[in-house]
Design a protein with these regions (language model features):
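Cell-wall glycan
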Residues: 56-70
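Glycine-centered tight-turn and secondary-structure capping sites
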Residues: 26-31, 71
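Well-structured core secondary-structure elements of compact alpha/beta domains
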Residues: 1-26, 41-57, 86-93
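Short acidic-hydrophobic surface loop/beta-edge motif
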Residues: 73-79
């Protein structure tokens, strides 16, 4: 089964996520933004969620993460937890 490794930043609003996406486009490191702004405990690790397969994350998050190319960052994704920016950091087929 294919697994991916991803990092994410979890915030309360779409506006916050969009502002962080602008910071990323302006060259701020994803890991630094995760440490500073993410509400998820993974923020301490730069947002790293380690390796996971399909069925291990909530559906909107999983769909967005598995659609990314390695190194790519998603548009803001809404789940019941809030708004995520997801960065795909590895693919293990």
């Amino acid at each position: 089964m294919m697994k991916i490794r991803a990092s994410h930043i979890l915030v309360d609003t779409k506006e916050q996520a969009e502002n962080l996406l602008l910071d990323l486009k302006n060259g701020v490191a994803f890991e630094d933004l995760a440490k500073q702004y993410s509400k998820c405990p993974s923020g301490r690790d730069g947002g790293d969620l380690r390796w996971f397969g399909k069925g291990m994350m909530v559906k909107p998050f999983e769909d967005a993460a598995f659609a990314l190319k390695e190194g790519e960052v998603s548009e803001p994704v809404e789940t019941q937890f809030g708004w995520h920016l997801i960065k795909l950091t590895g693919i293990d087929e």
